[in-house]
């Protein structure tokens, strides 16, 4: 049973955000170690947030173009 594209488009960013909030609440030194852009930790948190957001808006734009073209 596969989930549809609109469901995955909403579900993946929400799961990624929930994972970030979970790791922020569990890890004791989360804010101290990940605020500097020179640290690798900053980018290891930035990529899991950026990629689902990019995919969401890319698919949203693509679906909008498809719907505009067919109406």
Curated annotation (Swiss-Prot):
Pathway per the UniProt entry: Glycolipid biosynthesis; glycosylphosphatidylinositol-anchor biosynthesis
Membrane topology: Multi-pass membrane protein
Protein keywords: Disease variant, Endoplasmic reticulum, GPI-anchor biosynthesis, Intellectual disability, Membrane, Transmembrane, Transmembrane helix
Lumenal-side segments: 27-44
Gene Ontology terms describing biological process: GPI anchor biosynthetic process
Segments on the Cytoplasmic face: 1-3, 66-71
Main location: endoplasmic reticulum
Keyword Nucleotidyltransferase: no
Family annotation (InterPro entries): PIG-Y
Localization terms from the record: Endoplasmic reticulum membrane
Transmembrane segments: 4-26, 45-65
Classification via Pfam families: PIG-Y (PF15159)
GO cellular component terms listed in the entry, alphabetical order: endoplasmic reticulum membrane; glycosylphosphatidylinositol-N-acetylglucosaminyltransferase (GPI-GnT) complex; plasma membrane
Function (record text): Part of the glycosylphosphatidylinositol-N-acetylglucosaminyltransferase (GPI-GnT) complex that catalyzes the transfer of N-acetylglucosamine from UDP-N-acetylglucosamine to phosphatidylinositol and participates in the first step of GPI biosynthesis. May act by regulating the catalytic subunit PIGA.
Other facts: PREY and PIGY, 2 apparently unrelated proteins, are respectively the product of an upstream and a downstream ORF contained in a single bicistronic transcript.
Record disease entry: Hyperphosphatasia with impaired intellectual development syndrome 6: An autosomal recessive, multisystem disorder characterized by severe developmental delay, dysmorphism, seizures, cataracts, and early death in some patients.
Subunit structure: Component of the glycosylphosphatidylinositol-N-acetylglucosaminyltransferase (GPI-GnT) complex composed at least by PIGA, PIGC, PIGH, PIGP, PIGQ, PIGY and DPM2. Interacts directly with PIGA; this interaction regulates glycosylphosphatidylinositol-N-acetylglucosaminyltransferase activity. Does not interact with Ras proteins.
Protein name: Phosphatidylinositol N-acetylglucosaminyltransferase subunit Y
Record gene name: PIGY
């Amino acid at each position: 049973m596969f989930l549809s594209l609109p469901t995955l488009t909403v579900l993946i960013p929400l799961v990624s955000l929930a994972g970030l909030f979970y790791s922020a609440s569990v890890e004791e030194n989360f804010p101290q170690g990940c605020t500097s852009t020179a640290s690798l930790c900053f980018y290891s948190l930035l990529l899991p947030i950026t990629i689902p957001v990019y995919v969401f808006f890319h698919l949203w734009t693509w679906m909008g173009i498809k719907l505009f073209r067919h109406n």
